[in-house]
Amino acid sequence: MSVQDVLWIVLTVQLSFGLAYFENNQRTQDYDVDKNGSVHHKNWVRNEMMDSLGLYWLKWWINANENSIYFEVTVHTRGFAGLGFSKDGRLARADMVLMWVDDATGHPNVLDCHGALHPSSGPPLQDDTQNYDVLDGKQNGTHTILKFKRKIETCDPFDIPLSADTFKVLWSIGENDPIHGNLDWQGQSRGVKALQLFSPMFTKNSHSIEGIQKWDITVNNVTIDRSMDTLYWCKIVRLPELTGKQHIIGYEPLLSGKYERNVVHHMTLFECQSKIYSGSDPSSWDLWVRSAGTVCNSNLLTPRDWDSCSTPVAVWSLGSDGQFLPPHAGIPMGGASGVSYYMLEIHYDNPDGKESVDHSGFRIHYTPNLRTYDSGILISGVSISETQLIPPGQKKYRSVGICGPSCSSVMFPKDGIKIISGTLHSHQAGRTISLRHVRSGKELNPIIVDENYDYRHQKVHQLANETVVLPGDYLITDCSYETKYRKRPTFGGYSTKEEMCLTFITYYPKIEMSGCYSMTPVREFFEMFRVYQFYSLNMTDVENMFLYNSDYTDYSKQAKNATNKPNSGKTSKEDVIYQESLLNKLVISDPAEFHDRTFLSHLNQLPWHDPLFTKRVEQAFITGTHMTFCRVSKDSLSIPSEIIRYPEFTAYVKPPAACLNYLFTDNEELRSGSSQFFTDFTLSLLLLIQLGLQTTLL
């Protein structure tokens, strides 16, 4: 074995424990506790393996006093390393930096660059202003290590201002040092990884814990046929034998096959209250444990008792690595008051018509060494229903889900709950999601904001500063969608071609609440579009179909059949969704001008191309009435639903950008043009301001 091989093995072992090679790291993660009992994590350090082989490691941390972010890269090369930040993962317009240690002099170099306007325009371009400061760098026979920093906001039009959003972090490895004048990024290896740069991240090794055990929960050979575009599959499992109460400290996904070929879109593990329904046979649960499972949310196939499986304990979405909790909180399992059964729900998304057999699930990490607080997960946002509507052809259209005082005043403890983290969830049209917080008529700082949401990269947003939510507070999940290239309305639903607007909130102390949702009241939804009655169905029947997932055939024996069928030709999967939609079965009788038209057909004829009309619809849905639901763990619906108006409050105003040039960062053409434009514009603006002041003084 060569000396280089030995060094490589040593480096790999060190990195596996989150240590930086050749570095004496003085930062020790700690935390403060404020007067409300909320934890504020300080001095945290993130360390991420950027590739699948451990050739490129990126470490970073925030220095809030300096408004700076520090980076350290350790790369298996004696050539160059590239690092970049992008909203969409493309090299074009990316904020980039090239790094290397000169082979001749040993001098470390960090070069601030940006991607050309078009990828075909050539290699990255050097920035006029260099905003990365190199701190240290060295190399040995196999590896290059560089440490550098930059301001979070540099006021350079070619640098992306860093934030809590999800960024696509680009990386590249080159065999040789860059040749003078040649900034070619295309090295021997390159890739992209979605990261949240402002979030700490906890792992099994964040704090020394003895006695950690694992529990693997998977489905058994679920077959996904080519014809299945969307499938929700549920499997009941029994808690393993435990010696008293334990704490779940984290969980990871167990995915079948390679990531790029996997059809698993979303997974949730729920607690089941097996004694919730009178007359239920307790022995049925053990029978279900031995079965392979069945289709979820089916009136015909899903046992009614499974409705009691409503409290999440583990959540995974596409692009996530799972979650580990901070050292003072753990999700309880087992013990005298714990549940015995859990339900694993897996959402399969199969748009390409693949045939596969799946055995995915979770690996649960737990310990008998109990932590200070019992933690829980609750779901908040828009109730999944076709009453959530997103018009076609929209660059930005918002929907909101409200968790209001009907839940928080009743279920939250006097001192409130403390939010640890949140997973934001929508489907393909989602672009921006935030979890907003309102108290006493004033909106506080948003708890979570991701203005660069990507449904393919739904990582947990771990909070550096926990947020207290008190009884009487509102939580508002606010989602923005883009449907520029869609020709028909998009509705709320379970397929990725339909939409959701949810936040999975991890918090403590645990309360007996699993969900807090809202939706547009059914009657108001139809009246919004001047529809008041359907053939042979009164509006109460229609409301029941939406609220309780009732079968249309139970109400429609006398209903008029005027289903809107797609045009002749090949039927797309979107056509199938529209054909099966309840809105496509409801035939309008009042008003007369719309009679004999399905409600779906009626929606398709509305002037969605008119921005004033669409804006009125958006605002009417947001500021109008909302039906709120408080789902309690011990009962399927113990707190009655309530119809409320959107709360009146003073909205939170984001602080103005510290940098003038950032006013134009949304305009990609300007941002990627010549920096001379910004220089000229800034000088002109300053001159105008000076002239204005002189005029005022005169």
Curated annotation (Swiss-Prot):
It is found in: Secreted. InterPro entries: Cu2_ascorb_mOase-like_C, Cu2_ascorb_mOase_CS-1, Cu2_ascorb_mOase_N, Cu2_ascorb_mOase_N_sf, Cu2_monoox_C, DBH-like, DOH_DOMON, DOMON_domain. The lineage of its organism: Eukaryota, Metazoa, Ecdysozoa, Arthropoda, Hexapoda. It comes from the Eukaryota. Its EC number is 1.14.17.-. It comes from Drosophila melanogaster (Fruit fly). Its main location: secreted. This is MOXD1 homolog 1. Keywords: Copper, Disulfide bond, Glycoprotein, Metal-binding, Monooxygenase, Oxidoreductase, Secreted, Signal. Binds 2 copper ions per subunit.
